[in-house]
Every structure is written in structure tokens, then in C-alpha cells.
């Protein structure tokens, strides 16, 4: 390896010559160590052959030794496992040594299929024959999942070998070796002598090297599975336990460099998609909302060691019967001409199936039949354990019989090709397959008579059994022992091959196992040859259960009168719908009714039936809108072939829940009440009912799912009844697929009328016009009107909004101003000059057609924004210049006072959201703003949670900040204290300022408010001050407006202030609390308050501030405890530098039952704090624990349960919470433990939020405590008893006590109510002497009782009521004792 000739020696060689065996690997090896290892491997591999070689050489002499060497060299055989020539001149094989096997097993156990395993296998198996390789593989005890994956790869490679090396028909010449098949190379069907013969032949066939190459391919696949570099590489092995797969999945997921949203998506999709087929079927059955706990419970026992046990049992039986004679496959002819490799999957030449990028073709690659994959095919299979006993050779690609049927049975049935014999037919002749196939129903056990080698018996057709097992039958011929696994364990059976079986008149030959079985079974090995298929009948579309809202009844709205022509039209429409089964006639027993009416269709004389479902919609349960928006053509990828379909009578093809149909009843009246009205109810989804869109979308998705899975190369966009079908197929193939789709929909009752079947462009779809390489909106005509109504303006704005997605530059702000306020649709609206100008510009824009292009996933998305003025923005999203994907506008003004940069930021967030919806990613932004202005804004704009990737583009007008506020007071300039006041009753006020130099100015105001007066005072100070000024105000309103740095406003007064601000060189604005004795502020406050407002003496301010400095109470607590106005309490909190709250997190809904606590561990200053939160009240228990262990956690839970009633705790899946100690504590204290979703903090939302709150309070009081545990308890005290708010305005401590007390009172009250309800009341009115009743007793007071009689609530004086216990119907006689018992 070059170390001997190195110029470096000693320590230098050690320092510099370092080698990584694996690219990117951590371990590095010294060159001399690698040289030593190579010598040791070479010496070690030859050591155990030395003795026999020396004997051979001494007996046969140098000539034989030379010949042996020559033979070996010519065959290219390594010295690791030499083929030596014995004394008789025969080539013999030296078996693999135990030391080599031990080294291999140790590698696998220590490395666990890490990448190092592959070079180790390659080195240890150098020169090995297939038998040696199988010996190595059999030595691996565990890792059956990996072995199964390896076995599948070998099966695929063996099948590929058979395809590329076909055998020739005819006998083999004497002395000539047969051609090796794939299973021969794998050592399954070949002897050791045959392997030696192939290896030493001239020319040689290196079967050992070929087999090693297959194994290395399989090991690569296993290594990728066990050591993934990305979450996308995680796959569950076929026999791998689901638990192990989940462990690997989450371990890799933690290391993924992705956002939490992406990780959540990976968990929701990849975990199920990459499970093995058995687990995936179970997981899909659980539904999309299944928790990880439910998944692991459902998949328990799937995979694992059971497969390994069965294989080992079979191997043991093979070993015990090694004395049996070997019977080999018949030898074939020499190899034919080499052919190009061809993929089993896609049929294309040039690559193998394992490297194919196309979606996997359904069905078996070997026999072509669906229902199994090649690895499960009943043809020849490779097994690591060598089966040396006799079994017949099968054709590798023999196709099973398959029948094409058009009419399926109504029940789930087994179909067997070949009918029963007719009485007059000869029983001995073979029957031809007819269309009159025997049908065996599965409503009962399918037991049928079977002839096995002429012996009649009864057997069960079992599609779940691999093998055919018969009991108590005598068969002739050779047999071999076998052990099979059943429900009760393993049973020993005899395996007979080539047995003749006759079922339903059809004869087949197959393998039968004879042994003790509870029932005779015909398994899949025979059913497949019979062509037997399991038929699942296609049922009608599954109905979605629907209910009314709780406590509501159906609609009972009377039908209003209708004209004669409408009654006639409705009668004809309903008669036709009844024939089609869409509606059914009902009788008078249905008490519900919804009014109907009729309108004429546009441009037609035909009538259209409408049902006024408004009342039913109010009473129907809410539905989740399955599809939240319409698909956009800018998100479509360019397709070679496109078709647009429309589903006819979409809603009327979906059935309505039978229990809900009665609520859709309606009535067709008669003229002059000639006859009773004809009553109908809907059997299908009605038009206008709130549930129809969601149910239809869900049903259509389920129906299209099988077609999508079968045709992954077809893109189908589905929105309601519009279908877009695109593909990259040639037009003829594409149209065939479209016809398949139409037939698929037709089977489910959905028609696609030819009238709306669009085959050629342009395609009209969802209001768009699609061309092969571009798209646009359908032609837009803006109306020309002299008089505009509100309704006309609304329609016009709708058209312009629709056009703006491809026509850049459209503005609608002035048009929207025309219809502000509450106006009738028919009110006439005069166009303002600004609106007329805006409309004219828009006409000019839409007069020239504009087209968009389709999305290319390989190119970058770019969004460019321009300012149009007047708070309006336009943008274009494109991938290539001048080829827009789509355009849009933004004109929303969230605040009355704003600036261009804030609006630009809002527009960027809107475009980013839109891009994620359409393309799944955000674009790169080009913004008309200087970098300094943009970064200055974002630095202060703390509400921002995301800053986009962007670049500057010089597109006038540029956006900039027109002025900025200083962060520190300006020392050399005047300070203006400003204030304003107004009287709410008289609307009069004053505004003014006082400077630190004694200058002052006060003006009087009319028809003003406090806020306007405050702003006017600021304006006065700005107008009278120099270029640099300090301004102090006590108004949060003024401070909030100016600190947002607006450059335009809807308020004229604010616009004047902005103009003055722009003129200044430097401005410093500060806030101080009012009425605190602050010099200038107090002075100006007295000036402007004189005669305007009454200032209350708030003596609680000082005490409130003192308490806040100590406990940092929130404003609600101070307002309540010290009788302060909310504004004053808020100002005290806002002025505290430790209580500047920057927004609050949004929370979802959690279970707030009284006994539920959320528990979590958080970390601070390197220590562990365990926190328990009472969910309903927000009350906290927390303490510092020595370590995050199960023992400490259990001790804390027991203390918590000793203080408060704890019914349920909700924790995460941390090891301390899942420990046995915690489980034991919960069991003892009778606490139910629930777990959140792993790695999803939202499932622990309450405690996660309060962890942050607790840390914030600790930070506020940390300097008051020496130890962290002291600060934690101080923070708990402050949170529980010094912070008010939430439900009831209580502190958390008051709230938990109130909740527990209320819960106890409610429970006791419920007991009393249940006790009271056991009594019945007889009563009488003052005017009626007859006793009435019995009525139900609801409440018993001191002077009266509350009863319910026939649904009516009544209050009856105690003296006029008799209360008796309800003893049941057996004592209901008039003279019974109960009738005379009076509770009084």
C-alpha cells in the first residue's frame, strides 16, 4: 500500500498518513495499520489450508502442484478458499473455516449492518463458492428483517439471470455440464460438485463471484435501511417489528435539519407510507387522526421473530434428513447469445428493476398476475437453507389462469373457472372453461368435496393459507418431512409432490401436505392453479351519517303560494326525479317541510326547481370544508395531453343518509287547494343544502383514489364536479386513460356527458382558459353604464378582482370607497372623478389579452412588487422574465395610520402565503426598498416572525422611511410636555404644552375628544419647536401612533403631524404615567384640565407601584386590589422594564375538566424544574428536583396528589414519565396518565405556555433570591396569588378553589336532583278541584314545588301538591298504598 516506500518515517508517518476507509467517516486509520491488516488477512486466510496443501504437494509432486496452481489461476480463484487437486487428480473444495465464520458473525453483531459490513463481507468471502456464502449467511442468527430484504434482492437477481440466460430445449450431451440457472447460482438447486465444475470449466462460469455480487447488492440495500442518512431513506423491513421501525424513524427525524412544520408533515405522511405492506394496511385502517400509541398497539406482533422461528424449524428438519438422496434439476443446453438487460417494472432496456425510477408496476414481475409480488410468487424461490430433497422444477414465468368478467356477483364469492359437469356428460373428459363459472358464497364456510389422487374428501377453501393440508389420506411415492406453523403452533407433516387434485371438475397437479390438521385445507398453491379468484362486489357509494345540531328539530316552514305555471313545472320536474330515484313520495307521517319555488333558466324557457334550505341549514350539524380553495392554473405543470371533464348531476349521484332524508321533505301545492299537496323527500344530496359540497367532495375523492393509485402518471385536479386530467402520454394513449376514468366513474353512477367533455384546447376550466403552453382568465367584458347601482359596482369589483390574477396593475380602491357603509343593492351610486379615472385605467389594462405560463418545478420562483400609490400595490410571480405565472394586487390597510414599509411587509406575507398554497414553497422577493430602510424597520418591528429572502430592485417609486425617532433624549434642546383634555358631555376641550424653560401654550377646542386633544397638543409642540426637540406625553394613544412611524393616515390631524415630523432633524418621544407628580407633566395637566375634567385623587397608585415592583402583578390584579382605572394599571405595567410583553401565543382547545393536570420538566440555570399545571384554572405547583428521573417524578406526583384532587395527568413521552416508578405512583393514587404527541409541543400547550410564564417571573424576581429553588417558589406564589385575569377575573389560586368547590356542589346537587326525580306529584289548580298528575318533580322548595307535566313547567304551592314515591307500574292501582302516601 505504499507505506514501505514512504519518505516519512516514525512519528511523522503516524501524524500525516491517515486514511478514511469510508467517505465522510469519522474514523481514520494509520497507513501502517492498514498494511498490517492486509497482511494479517492474507496470512490468516491461507493459514488453515497449509497442512493439506503440503500433504497434497508431497504426494503428487511439483508437477501436480503446478497443475493445480495453474488451474486455480486460470479460473481466477483467490487463495482464500482454494480448490486443490487430490491424489486422484480431482478438484476438491476446502470448506470455510470456523475462524472466518466467527469473524463474520462478530462483524454483523458489532456493526449491525453499518457501511463497514460490506467491505468486510467482500474480504472474508473472497473466492468463496455459493455454498460458502450461504454458510456465512446462515451463521447470522438475528436480523431476520435484513435477511428477508437480502433474500428478495437475490430472488430478483436470480430471475434477471434466468431472463438473460435462457435454456435451450433438447438433451444434454454426455459429459457436458448443464447451464446454471439463477437458483443454481444462489446454491439452492445446485450441488457442490456442480459449483466446482462451473468454476473450473473452460471457459469458467464464476458462480461464486456472481452470487457474491448479488449478496453485496442486497447488503447495500440493507445498509441504507439500517443506517439512513435522511428521513426519506427510512423503510420498514418486511419482517421488522413496527416498534423498531418507529425507533429508527424518530431517531433520524430528530437529526433532520428541518422546521417543526416539515417534521410534523414527515411524521404524518412518511411514517405510514414507508411502513411494510402489512403495517401500512393496519395504519391506513386506523385513519388519519391516529396517535402513535394507537399505531404501535395495532401493529404489535406484526413482523418480528416468528418468521425466523419457522425458517429455523424447517432448517432443523432438513438437517435431520441429510441422508436422503439428492435429485437435481434437469440439465440445460449451453448459454445462448447475450441480450440487453431489460427492466421487469417499466419494460425499458438499459437498467434493472431495482434501479427503475418509474412507479412500481402492480402485480408479480415473474408470472404477471396481480395479488402478489415476485418475492411471494409460487414459482422457484431462493432460500439460504439448502433444500436438497426432491421437488419438481417449475417454469419461472408461467402465467396463472385469469378470467375476464363483466358482471360481478351480488355477494362476496369465490369464482372457480370451469363449470360443474352436467348429468349427461362424460365425467372423465377435461372440461373447457365456460362463462358459467361456479360461485361459492362466503356467507358460510366454503367446504366442498375434493378428490385427491382419486380419494374423495371434504376440504375448506382457504385463501389465507399458503399450503394445502389434508388429514387421514394415504398417498403413494416419496415424501419429505416438513414443519409448518399454524394458529396452535408448529405441526409435523409429510410433503408429497406431483399429487393430482380434482375440484369442481377441474384437475390440477400440485403439492399436498399430509398431517394432523383440525380441518382439511385447500391453500393458495392449488387455488392459484385453479384460477380461483376472490370477488368483492362493488357496493353503492357509502353514505355519510348526518345529524341535526343537538337539541334541534327539523324545519317546519309552510309552503308559500305558487302560480299555476310554476306548479306545473315543478310537478313535471319532480315526476322525472322520482323516476330516476332522486326523490321519493312520502305520507302525512312526516311533520317536516321546506318551501320550494321555481325560476326560469337563463336564455331558456325551461324551469329550474329551487328549495329554500335556509332553515334546514341552520339546524344541520356543521361540516368541515374538505377543499379549502380552488386549484390555480399557475400551479399546474405543463402537460403533453390535457382533457377537461364535467360530472353530470354531481350531487344527485351521491346518496343521502337514510335517517336524515325525512328532514328534506317538501310539498308541491295545488291550485285553489283542489287536492292535498304532493309530498316528497330527497334520496340524494340536495342542491342548496349546506352538507352537499363537503359530502360530494369526500365521496369523489374516495372514488378517484383507486384510479389515481393505478395510474400514478395521470394528474387529476378535482374541484366539485370539474375534473382536469393531464398526462405526458401521447394523445391516443391519454384518451384511452380518460375513457378508463369515465368508465370507472360510471361504475359508481357518475356520468361525464359528452357535451362537457373537452378534448381540444382551449379548455374552459374553473373560470380559466387553458392552452397547451399558457393560460388566462376567460374573456372579461367590463360593462358600460350611465347609472351605476351598488349591485353593479359589486359585480364590477368582482370581475376586476378575478382579472387581477393575470392582468398586472389593476386598482379598485376608489371603486370600493363608493359602496362603503350600509346601502341597498338597488341604490344608485354616482362615480367620483377618482373612481372614473380608476375604471378607465382598468378598461385599458383588460383590453389587451394577457397570458400566464405553467409552473416548472426545476426553476426558482421570483416575486416582484411595485407600489402604485394611494396604498395600493401590484406584484408578479414568475420563473423567467416577462413570463408571469400569476399576478395580483394588495390594497388592504390594516390600520388607519400606517407607512409604506409596513404595507410592503404585509404584502410580502400575503404573497408568501399564497405561494405556499399554490406551489408549496415561498418565492425570492424583489422589493423596491433600500436595504437600510428595510432592515431598520424589521429591527424594531417585533411582531415579525418571519423575514423573507429578498433583493433590492430599483423600480420607482422607491419605499423609504421619511423620518425616524431617537432612542435617547437629545441633551442640548428643549423638552415639551404635551397634554390634552376634553369633556365628554360638552365636547369642549383644551390642548397645550409646557417646556422645561417655562414656555407654555394652551388653546381651546370645540367638538373634540380626549384623543383629538392629545394629538392637537403634539401638533402644537411640533409647530412651535426647533429642528431638534424632546417631547413628553402621558398618552399611550399618541405614543402608539407615532412609534409606528406612519407616512400617511386617514386622519387629517395625523397627516399634519406627519408633515411636521418630516421637517424635523431629530425627534425624541417619551411617555410618562399621568398624575404621578412628574414636574412638566403635572403642570401641563393642570393647565389643560382646568374647567374641563375632574381629576380624582388616586391614593392607591403608590401602593400599587410598590407592590408591582415587588411581585410584578399584572394590571388586572392591581386594578382590582387598589381600585385603579384599567388605563392607569396598564400604564404602570407598561412602564416596568421587566414586564414588556411582546405578544401572546395562540392556544388551541384542551380538556379543562376539574381533575386534569399537565406535567412537564423544564430547565433553567442547568437545573431541572418540574411543573404541574391545573388546566382548568392555570394554578401551578413547581419545584427544583435533583435529577430528571422516574423516582423524583413519582415523588412529586404523590405530593401533588396529597394536596389536590388529581384524576388525570397529561405528560410527554420522556423517560422519566414513562418509567415504572411513575406508573406505580399513578396506579397507587388512582391517577390516569395520558401522553402527548411525541416532538409536538402543542399537545402540552398549557404547561409549555406556563413554563415560559414561570421563567419570565423567575427572571423578574431572580435578583431577590440567592438560590434558584427559592426564586421558583417565589414565582409560583406570584403567579398563583398576585396575577388576576381569565375566567371570573380571579387569581389562579382563587380559581382552583372555586372550581373544586363548584364541582363538589354540582355533584351534590346532581345527587339531590336524581333523588328528587324519583318522586311523582299529584296537584290541583285553585279553580279545579280534580287532582291532576302524576307529574315529574324537578325541585322542592320551602313553600312551593317545580313540576313538569306533559312538557309544561309549573310552580305549585306545597299545600296543593301531593308528593309520592314512584314504585313502578305494578302498584299503579287507584287504591294502592302509594296513592295515599303524602310526603308532607
Swiss-Prot record:
Alphabetically ordered keywords of this record: Aspartyl protease, Capsid protein, DNA integration, DNA recombination, DNA-binding, DNA-directed DNA polymerase, Endonuclease, Eukaryotic host gene expression shutoff by virus, Eukaryotic host translation shutoff by virus, Host cell membrane, Host cytoplasm, Host gene expression shutoff by virus, Host membrane, Host nucleus, Host-virus interaction, Hydrolase, Lipoprotein, Magnesium, Membrane, Metal-binding, Multifunctional enzyme, Myristate, Nuclease, Nucleotidyltransferase, Phosphoprotein, Protease, Repeat, RNA-binding, RNA-directed DNA polymerase, Transferase, Viral genome integration, Viral nucleoprotein, Viral penetration into host nucleus, Viral release from host cell, Virion, Virion maturation, Virus entry into host cell, Zinc, Zinc-finger
UniProt: Mg(2+) 1 binding residues: 646, 721-722
Active-site residues, as the UniProt record annotates them: 462 (for protease activity)
Catalytic activity, reaction form: Specific for a P1 residue that is hydrophobic, and P1' variable, but often Pro; Endohydrolysis of RNA in RNA/DNA hybrids. Three different cleavage modes: 1. sequence-specific internal cleavage of RNA. Human immunodeficiency virus type 1 and Moloney murine leukemia virus enzymes prefer to cleave the RNA strand one nucleotide away from the RNA-DNA junction. 2. RNA 5'-end directed cleavage 13-19 nucleotides from the RNA end. 3. DNA 3'-end directed cleavage 15-20 nucleotides away from the primer terminus; 3'-end directed exonucleolytic cleavage of viral RNA-DNA hybrid; DNA(n) + a 2'-deoxyribonucleoside 5'-triphosphate = DNA(n+1) + diphosphate
Keyword set includes Transmembrane: no
InterPro entries for this protein: Aspartic_peptidase_AS, DNA/RNA_pol_sf, Gag_p24_C, Integrase-like_N, Integrase_C_dom_sf_retrovir, Integrase_C_retrovir, Integrase_cat-core, Integrase_Zn-bd_dom_N
Ranges where the Integrase catalytic domain occurs: 1150-1300
Binding site residues for Mg(2+) 2: 979, 1014, 1034, 1085
Protein residues bound to Mg(2+) 3: 1160, 1212
Biased composition (Basic and acidic residues): 410-430
Region annotation Disordered: where it falls in the sequence: 47-74, 402-433
PROSITE patterns with a match to the protein in the record: ASP_PROT_RETROV, ASP_PROTEASE, INTEGRASE, INTEGRASE_DBD, RNASE_H_1, RT_POL, ZF_CCHC, ZF_INTEGRASE
Motif, Nuclear localization signal: chain positions: 26-32
Disulfide linkage: none
Entry cofactors: Mg(2+)
Record region (RT 'primer grip'): 763-771
Motif Tryptophan repeat motif positions after renumbering to this chain: 934-950
Site annotation Essential for RT p66/p51 heterodimerization: residues: 937, 950
Domain Peptidase A2: start-end pairs: 457-526
Note: The reverse transcriptase is an error-prone enzyme that lacks a proof-reading function. High mutations rate is a direct consequence of this characteristic. RT also displays frequent template switching leading to high recombination rate. Recombination mostly occurs between homologous regions of the two copackaged RNA genomes. If these two RNA molecules derive from different viral strains, reverse transcription will give rise to highly recombinated proviral DNAs.
Role, per record: Gag-Pol polyprotein and Gag polyprotein may regulate their own translation, by the binding genomic RNA in the 5'-UTR. At low concentration, Gag-Pol and Gag would promote translation, whereas at high concentration, the polyproteins encapsidate genomic RNA and then shut off translation.
Protein name in the entry: Gag-Pol polyprotein
Organism: Simian immunodeficiency virus (isolate CPZ GAB1) (SIV-cpz)
Amino acid at each position: 500500500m505504499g507505506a514501505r516506500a514512504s519518505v516519512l518515517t516514525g512519528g511523522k508517518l503516524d501524524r500525516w498518513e491517515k486514511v478514511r476507509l469510508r467517505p465522510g467517516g469519522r474514523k481514520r486509520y494509520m497507513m501502517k495499520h492498514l498494511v498490517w491488516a492486509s497482511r494479517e488477512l492474507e496470512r490468516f486466510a491461507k493459514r488453515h489450508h497449509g497442512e493439506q496443501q503440503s500433504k497434497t504437494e508431497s504426494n503428487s509432486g511439483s508437477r501436480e502442484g503446478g497443475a493445480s496452481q495453474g488451474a486455480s489461476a486460470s479460473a481466477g480463484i483467490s487463495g482464500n478458499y482454494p480448490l486443490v487437486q487430490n491424489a486422484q487428480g480431482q478438484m476438491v473444495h476446502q470448506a470455510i473455516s470456523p475462524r472466518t465464520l466467527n469473524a463474520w458473525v462478530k462483524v454483523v453483531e458489532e456493526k449491525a449492518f453499518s457501511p463497514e459490513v460490506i467491505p468486510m463481507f467482500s474480504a472474508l468471502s473472497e473466492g468463496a463458492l455459493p455454498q460458502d456464502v450461504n454458510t456465512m449467511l446462515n451463521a447470522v442468527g438475528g436480523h431476520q428483517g435484513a435477511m428477508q430484504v437480502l433474500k428478495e434482492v437475490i430472488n430478483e437477481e436470480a430471475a434477471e439471470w434466468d431472463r438473460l440466460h435462457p435454456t435451450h430445449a433438447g438433451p444434454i450431451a454426455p459429459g457436458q455440464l448443464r447451464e446454471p440457472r439463477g437458483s443454481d447460482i444462489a446454491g439452492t438447486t445446485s450441488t457442490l460438485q456442480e459449483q466446482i465444475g462451473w468454476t473450473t470449466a473452460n471457459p469458467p462460469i464464476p458462480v461464486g463471484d456472481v452470487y457474491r455480487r448479488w449478496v453485496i447488492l442486497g447488503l447495500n440495500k440493507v445498509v441504507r435501511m439500517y443506517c439512513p442518512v435522511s428521513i426519506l431513506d427510512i423503510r420498514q423491513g418486511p419482517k421488522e417489528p413496527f416498534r423498531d421501525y418507529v425507533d429508527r424513524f424518530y431517531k433520524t427525524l430528530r437529526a433532520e435539519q428541518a422546521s417543526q412544520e416539515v417534521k410534523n408533515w414527515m411524521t404524518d405522511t412518511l411514517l405510514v407510507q414507508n411502513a411494510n405492506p402489512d403495517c401500512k394496511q393496519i395504519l391506513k385502517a386506523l385513519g388519519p387522526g391516529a396517535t402513535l400509541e394507537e399505531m404501535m398497539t395495532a401493529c404489535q406482533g406484526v413482523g418480528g421473530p416468528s418468521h425466523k422461528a419457522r425458517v429455523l424449524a424447517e432448517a432443523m428438519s432438513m438437517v435431520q434428513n441429510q441422508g436422503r438422496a439428492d435429485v437435481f434439476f434437469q440439465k440445460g443446453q449451453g448459454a445462448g447469445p447475450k441480450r440487453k438487460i431489460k427492466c421487469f417494472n417499466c419494460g425499458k432496456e438499459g437498467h434493472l428493476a431495482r434501479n427503475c425510477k418509474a412507479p412500481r408496476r402492480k402485480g408479480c414481475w415473474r408470472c404477471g398476475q396481480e395479488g402478489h409480488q415476485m418475492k411471494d410468487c409460487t414459482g422457484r424461490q431462493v432460500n439460504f437453507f439448502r433444500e436438497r430433497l426432491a421437488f419438481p422444477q417449475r417454469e419461472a414465468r408461467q402465467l396463472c389462469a385469469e378470467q375476464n368478467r363483466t358482471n360481478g356477483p351480488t355477494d362476496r364469492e369465490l369464482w372457480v373457472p370451469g363449470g360443474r359437469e352436467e348429468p349427461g356428460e362424460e365425467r372423465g373428459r377435461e372440461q373447457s372453461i365456460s362463462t358459467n363459472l361456479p360461485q361459492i358464497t362466503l356467507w358460510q364456510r366454503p367446504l366442498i368435496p375434493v378428490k385427491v389422487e382419486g380419494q374423495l374428501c371434504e376440504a375448506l377453501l382457504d385463501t389465507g393459507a399458503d399450503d394445502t393440508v389434508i388429514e387421514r389420506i394415504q398417498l403413494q411415492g416419496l415424501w419429505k418431512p416438513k414443519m409448518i406453523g399454524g394458529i396452535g403452533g408448529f405441526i409435523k407433516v409429510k410433503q408429497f409432490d406431483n399429487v393430482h387434485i380434482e375440484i369442481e371438475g377441474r384437475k390440477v397437479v400440485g403439492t399436498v401436505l399430509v398431517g394432523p390438521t383440525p380441518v382439511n385445507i385447500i391453500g393458495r398453491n392449488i387455488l392459484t392453479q385453479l384460477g380461483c379468484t376472490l370477488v368483492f362486489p362493488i357496493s353503492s357509494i357509502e353514505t355519510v351519517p348526518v345529524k341535526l345540531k343537538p337539541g334541534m328539530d327539523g324545519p317546519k316552514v309552510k309552503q308559500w303560494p305558487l302560480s299555476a305555471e310554476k306548479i306545473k313545472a315543478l310537478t313535471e320536474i319532480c315526476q322525472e326525479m322520482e323516476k330516476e330515484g332522486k326523490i321519493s313520495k312520502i305520507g302525512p307521517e312526516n311533520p317536516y317541510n321546506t318551501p320550494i319555488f321555481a325560476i326560469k333558466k337563463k336564455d331558456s324557457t325551461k324551469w329550474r326547481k329551487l328549495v329554500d334550505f335556509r332553515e334546514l341549514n341552520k339546524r344541520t350539524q356543521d361540516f368541515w370544508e374538505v377543499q379549502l380553495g380552488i386549484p390555480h392554473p399557475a400551479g399546474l405543470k405543463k402537460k403533453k395531453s390535457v382533457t377537461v371533464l364535467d360530472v353530470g348531476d354531481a350531487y344527485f349521484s351521491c346518496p343521502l343518509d337514510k335517517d336524515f332524508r325525512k328532514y328534506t321533505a317538501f310539498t308541491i301545492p295545488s291550485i285553489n287547494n283542489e287536492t292535498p299537496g304532493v309530498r316528497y323527500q330527497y334520496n340524494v344530496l340536495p342542491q342548496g343544502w349546506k352538507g352537499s359540497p363537503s359530502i360530494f367532495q369526500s365521496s369523489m375523492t374516495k372514488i378517484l383514489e383507486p384510479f389515481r393509485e393505478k395510474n400514478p402518471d395521470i394528474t387529476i385536479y378535482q374541484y366539485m364536479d370539474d375534473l382536469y386530467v393531464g398526462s405526458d402520454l401521447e394523445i391516443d394513449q391519454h384518451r384511452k386513460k380518460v375513457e378508463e376514468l369515465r368508465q370507472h366513474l360510471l361504475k359508481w353512477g357518475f356520468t361525464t356527458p359528452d357535451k362537457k367533455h373537452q378534448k381540444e384546447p382551449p379548455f374552459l376550466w374553473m373560470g380559466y382558459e387553458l392552452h397547451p403552453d399558457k393560460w388566462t382568465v376567460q374573456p372579461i367584458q367590463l360593462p358600460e353604464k350611465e347609472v351605476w347601482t351598488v349591485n353593479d359596482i359589486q359585480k364590477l369589483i368582482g370581475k376586476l378582482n378575478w382579472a387581477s390574477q393575470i392582468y398586472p396593475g389593476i386598482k379598485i380602491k376608489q371603486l370600493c370607497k363608493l359602496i362603503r357603509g350600509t346601502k341597498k343593492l338597488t341604490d344608485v351610486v354616482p362615480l367620483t372623478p377618482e373612481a372614473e379615472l380608476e375604471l378607465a385605467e382598468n378598461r385599458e389594462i383588460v383590453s389587451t389579452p394577457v397570458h400566464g405560463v405553467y409552473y416548472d418545478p426545476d426553476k426558482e420562483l421570483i416575486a416582484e412588487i411595485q407600489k402604485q400609490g394611494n396604498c395600493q400595490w401590484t406584484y408578479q410571480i414568475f420563473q423567467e422574465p416577462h413570463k408571469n405565472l400569476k399576478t395580483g394586487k394588495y390594497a388592504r390597510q390594516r390600520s388607519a395610520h400606517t407607512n409604506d414599509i409596513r404595507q410592503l411587509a404585509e404584502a410580502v406575507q400575503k404573497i408568501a402565503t399564497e405561494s405556499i398554497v399554490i406551489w408549496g414553497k415561498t418565492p425570492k422577493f424583489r422589493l423596491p426598498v433600500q436595504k437600510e430602510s428595510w432592515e431598520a424597520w424589521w429591527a424594531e418591528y417585533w411582531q415579525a416572525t418571519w423575514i423573507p429572502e429578498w433583493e433590492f430592485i430599483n423600480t420607482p417609486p422607491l419605499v423609504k422611511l421619511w423620518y425616524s425617532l431617537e432612542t435617547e433624549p437629545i441633551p442640548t434642546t428643549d423638552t415639551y410636555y404635551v397634554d390634552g383634555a376634553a369633556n365628554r358631555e360638552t365636547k369642549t376641550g383644551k390642548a397645550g404644552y409646557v417646556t422645561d424653560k417655562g414656555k407654555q401654550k394652551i388653546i381651546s377646542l370645540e367638538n373634540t375628544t380626549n384623543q383629538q386633544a392629545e394629538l392637537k397638543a403634539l401638533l402644537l409642540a411640533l409647530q412651535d419647536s426647533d429642528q431638534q426637540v424632546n417631547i413628553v406625553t402621558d398618552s399611550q394613544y399618541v405614543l402608539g401612533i407615532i412609534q409606528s412611524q406612519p407616512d400617511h393616515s386617514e386622519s387629517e390631524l395625523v397627516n399634519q403631524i406627519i408633515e411636521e415630523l418630516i421637517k424635523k432633524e431629530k425627534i425624541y418621544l417619551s411617555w410618562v404615567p399621568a398624575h404621578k407628580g412628574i414636574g412638566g407633566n403635572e403642570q401641563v395637566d393642570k393647565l389643560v384640565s382646568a374647567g374641563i375634567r375632574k381629576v380624582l385623587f388616586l391614593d392607591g397608585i403608590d401602593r400599587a407601584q410598590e407592590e408591582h415592583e415587588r411581585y410584578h402583578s399584572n394590571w388586572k390584579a392591581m386594578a382590582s386590589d387598589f381600585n385603579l382605572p384599567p388605563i392607569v394599571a396598564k400604564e404602570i405595567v407598561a412602564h416596568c422594564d421587566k414586564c414588556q410583553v411582546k405578544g401572546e401565543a395562540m392556544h388551541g382547545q384542551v380538556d379543562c375538566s376539574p381533575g386534569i393536570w399537565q406535567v412537564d420538566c423544564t430547565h433553567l440555570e442547568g437545573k431541572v424544574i418540574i411543573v404541574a399545571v391545573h388546566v382548568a384554572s392555570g394554578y401551578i405547583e413547581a419545584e427544583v428536583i435533583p435529577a430528571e428521573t422516574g423516582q423524583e417524578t413519582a415523588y412529586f406526583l404523590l405530593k401533588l396528589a396529597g394536596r389536590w384532587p388529581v384524576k388525570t395527568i397529561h405528560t410527554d413521552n420522556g423517560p422519566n414519565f414513562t418509567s415504572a416508578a411513575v406508573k406505580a405512583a399513578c396506579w397507587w393514587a388512582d391517577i390516569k396518565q395520558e401522553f402527548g404527541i411525541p416532538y409536538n409541543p402543542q399537545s402540552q400547550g398549557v404547561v409549555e405556555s406556563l413554563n415560559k410564564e414561570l421563567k419570565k417571573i423567575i427572571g423578574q424576581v431572580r435578583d431577590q433570591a440567592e438560590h434558584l429553588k427559592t426564586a421558583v417558589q417565589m414565582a409560583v406564589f406570584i403567579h398563583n396569588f398576585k396575577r388576576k385575569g381569565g375566567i371570573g377575573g380571579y387569581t389562579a389560586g382563587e380559581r382552583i378553589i372555586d372550581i373544586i368547590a363548584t364541582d363538589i356542589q354540582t355533584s351534590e346537587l346532581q345527587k339531590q336532583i336524581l333523588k328528587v326525580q324519583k318522586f311523582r306529584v299529584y296537584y290541583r289548580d285553585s279553580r279545579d278541584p280534580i287532582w291532576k298528575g302524576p307529574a315529574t318533580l324537578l325541585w322542592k322548595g320551602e313553600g312551593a314545588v317545580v313540576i313538569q307535566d306533559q312538557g309544561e313547567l309549573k310552580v305549585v304551592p306545597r299545600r296543593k301538591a301531593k308528593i309520592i314515591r314512584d314504585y313502578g307500574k305494578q302498584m299503579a292501582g287507584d287504591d294502592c298504598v302509594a296513592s295515599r302516601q303524602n310526603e308532607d
